[in-house]
Amino acid sequence: MSEYSVFTSESVSEGHPDKMADQISDAVLDAILTDDPNARVAVETLVKTGMAIVAGEVRTSTYVDLEDLIRQVILDIGYNSSDVGFDGASCAVLNAIGKQSADIAMGVDEGDQKDLGAGDQGLMFGYATNETAVLMPAPIFYAHRLVEKQAQLRKSGELPWLRPDAKSQVTLRYENGKPVAVDAVVLSTQHSPSVQQAEIHEAVRELIIKNVLPAEWLHKDTQYHINPTGQFIIGGPVGDCGLTGRKIIVDSYGGMARHGGGAFSGKDPSKVDRSAAYAGRYVAKNIVAAGLADKCEIQVSYAIGVAEPTSISINTFGTGKLPDAEIIKLVREHFDLRPRGLIEMLNLKRPIYRQTAAYGHFGRELPDFTWEKTDKADALKKAL
């Protein structure tokens, strides 16, 4: 039997205010890494009516025109007019970025005889399951695809009344550990004042929901909740303040796996909150791809300034073809989970992060998403 009879996950679009903040933080990170791959970056963003504020700590040898960059990110998302409630061309941009603490740098930097220490203490999780082709939990996978489709139809002009802010939620029914039906789907989308609710409901149901969710999972009792509160004209940073790092479950596994609590966006790869979570996904995905388990969760923990993980644990939820203790031995043999090792293993010192900041850090097999590769699976299979 499945651990859950039903399970629900949610996602939000690139125009959601928290996701705007994530994208701005990661755009700043990318701009710095482009010229200075060894930079130390920790950037937080706040967006609210008429303003975007960035703050944090950076140590770099390069210069970035932050104001122009931030404005362009906002415009690219689709906030380009007061008619939609926010305009990247005219909003205020405030910069409160300072230098990284020398005390932190002393413990984290690499020396001639020293490995890179972890940028902070903490615990991170990685997860994979064979219930989808990309080895992600189905509820979060399809929740992402719904809001991604909303953005596609908005940007193409096919549904010109769509606006950038949107949220989705998918409830799947499980039988014997596999998803078999959609019990409920929620999609709320910002829209122009001129469109009627009936048109919104029909277009969202036919062009978004039915184009994304498997037809065999939709049934006569599936609940469709489309803009259930009625009109959704006021959205984005006007409707809600947006902050970096407030969608950590959307960013990861939709609640299907545990989370260490650290956000990803705006952090360079010396911050294990991000890099070790990516490495955890890489490890778990390769374990499942190798057939060692149907699902796998890994936890890794670190102490600030110390290279070796303080712990590595594995849980295959009774689906492992080998004991979990044996799988941990394989992980230690095939994966270097020290900060420098995982940065090199996944080639993380690159300007690749803005594209991670909307529609999921995991489960999208894009060329730059090295943590989604299954290139260790063949070697792991030999243990069977």
UniProtKB/Swiss-Prot annotation:
Residues annotated as binding K(+): E44
Stored Pfam families: S-AdoMet_synt_C, S-AdoMet_synt_M, S-AdoMet_synt_N
Claim: ATP-binding is one of the keywords in the record: yes
Reaction it catalyzes: L-methionine + ATP + H2O = S-adenosyl-L-methionine + phosphate + diphosphate
Pathway note: Amino-acid biosynthesis; S-adenosyl-L-methionine biosynthesis; S-adenosyl-L-methionine from L-methionine: step 1/1
GO biological process, any: S-adenosylmethionine biosynthetic process
Gene3D superfamilies: 3.30.300.10
Keywords in alphabetical order: ATP-binding, Cytoplasm, Magnesium, Metal-binding, Nucleotide-binding, One-carbon metabolism, Potassium, Transferase
EC number: 2.5.1.6
Source organism, top-level taxon: Bacteria
Positions of region (Flexible loop): 100-110
Top-level EC class: transferase
GO cellular component: cytoplasm
Subcellular location field: Cytoplasm
Binding residues annotated for ATP, in chain numbering: H16, D165, A166, K167, D240, R246, K247, A263, K267
Cofactor(s) for this UniProt protein: Mg(2+); K(+)
Subunit structure: Homotetramer; dimer of dimers.
Similarity field: Belongs to the AdoMet synthase family.
Function of the protein: Catalyzes the formation of S-adenosylmethionine (AdoMet) from methionine and ATP. The overall synthetic reaction is composed of two sequential steps, AdoMet formation and the subsequent tripolyphosphate hydrolysis which occurs prior to release of AdoMet from the enzyme.
Cited HAMAP family: S_AdoMet_synth1
NCBIfam families for this protein: metK
Name recorded for this polypeptide: S-adenosylmethionine synthase
Gene: metK
